[in-house]
Amino acid sequence: MKAKELREKSVEELNTELLNLLREQFNLRMQVASGQLQQSHLLKQVRRDVARVKTLLNEKAGA
């Protein structure tokens, strides 16, 4: 997800997005542990998306 798209969202929407990303990250980690994940790059993408959302939440909290 692009940072520009995330900046347009409200704090509630960002919190919902963060929750969804953390669930997705958990599911991907479980797939890695069981040897089912073929696309390992998805872990990196989700981890960075989580960081983007958290950064924006901190920016909005400080403003």
UniProtKB/Swiss-Prot annotation:
Signal peptide location: none
Keyword Ribonucleoprotein: yes
Keyword Ribosomal protein: yes
Annotated disulfide bonds: none
GO terms of biological process kind: translation
One Pfam short name: Ribosomal_L29
InterPro entries in the record: Ribosomal_protein_uL29, Ribosomal_uL29, Ribosomal_uL29_CS, Ribosomal_uL29_sf
GO cellular component: cytosolic large ribosomal subunit
Keywords: Ribonucleoprotein, Ribosomal protein
Single annotated GO MF: structural constituent of ribosome
Similarity section: Belongs to the universal ribosomal protein uL29 family.
Protein name per UniProt: Large ribosomal subunit protein uL29
